[in-house]
Amino acid sequence: MKATIRNKLERMAERHEEIGAQLADPDVVGDPSKFAELSREYARLEPVVQDLNAYRAEADTVASAEAMLNDGDAEIRALAEQELAEAQRRLEELEGALQRHLVPTDPNDQRNIFLEVRAGAGGDEAALFAGDLLRMYMRYAERQGWKTEILSAREGEHGGYREVIARVSGRSVYARLKFESGAHRVQRVPATESQGRIHTSACTVAILPELDEVSAIEVNTADLRVDTFRSSGAGGQHVNTTDSAIRITHLPSGLVVECQDERSQNKNRAKAIALLQARLTEQERAKQQSERSEQRRLAVGSGDRSERIRTYNFPQGRVTDHRIGLTLYKLEQVMEGGMDELLDGLTQEHQAEALAEIAEDSG
């Protein structure tokens, strides 16, 4: 292990010990907010310390076994060789685990999300595919035990959606779905195609973290135009007889958001404001990223909505993620929410890219 990486890990272990002492301080115990904050940091560092202690123990075992290789007894040397091989294997595994601990965590990973699916090129077929994508994400959310709610929807003329926006809440939602932003392409024979020709259409997906009051961009009410309208029923579970649906226009940016999920106008307004803040924050993030031209793009993609990230080929039963070169002949399973193999591959690629940067920065 490189000395620079070892030093970073040692500092993390020292911080863990320091926090342990602070958590025993009566002044800290008497401050619930401070105690909770330190407890969370202590819990995050605990796996690092455990793996580092195990690494130290295995390093001692390796040194001991290497010393025994010079023993005059052939039987002892044979045992030492066996022990050395096993210890070196465990040491290598622990080194990998420790390096993964150094990968910076995304502060948004534990947040809920706004999922936006929009039909692109392809007309009616694109709208139908938008409906298929929404169903895929809903099924995946069910498997994860997450909660989903559709905030607004514009249905396609022949089914599906021209645009649909949902809120997904639960554990690690953003962490699992954050790489889904981008252009999704579908290749299949439409039901109305009499010649059996394959059509290509596309949808864009945007994954926006739902922000808390501290992280969200402050929205000046003077910059908003709020309109009310009667829910069409497409986005919610009912058809309103009152104008409870909300449309908010952010005048400086021109962004427009809607919510027609709730019967209460106030609840719809609160959800629409939260969605607007998420979009404004994402807009600012994208602007900053484009300005940092020297910043390396992740192998798994920049999250640009125009970037084609995945192709779903129905005649071949194939789904291909172009960012990591992964092809699965499990299209039906994926469309039913079996996305873990895709999502795991994207997460692993992201970690590998981050580890490569850590190694490079460590000289």
From Swiss-Prot:
InterPro entries: PCRF, Pep_chain_release_fac_I, Pep_chain_release_fac_I_sf, Prokaryotic/Mito_RF, RF-1. Keywords: Cytoplasm, Methylation, Protein biosynthesis. It is found in: Cytoplasm. Methylated by PrmC. Methylation increases the termination efficiency of RF1. The keyword Protein biosynthesis applies. The modification N5-methylglutamine is found at Q237. The lineage of its organism: Bacteria, Pseudomonadati, Pseudomonadota, Gammaproteobacteria, Chromatiales. It comes from the Bacteria. Residues 284-297 have a biased composition (Basic and acidic residues). GO terms for cellular component: cytoplasm. Peptide chain release factor 1 directs the termination of translation in response to the peptide chain termination codons UAG and UAA. NCBIfam families: prfA, PRK00591.1. One of its GO terms (molecular function) is translation release factor activity, codon specific. The keyword Protein biosynthesis applies. Belongs to the prokaryotic/mitochondrial release factor family. This is Peptide chain release factor 1. Residues 284-306 are annotated as: Disordered.
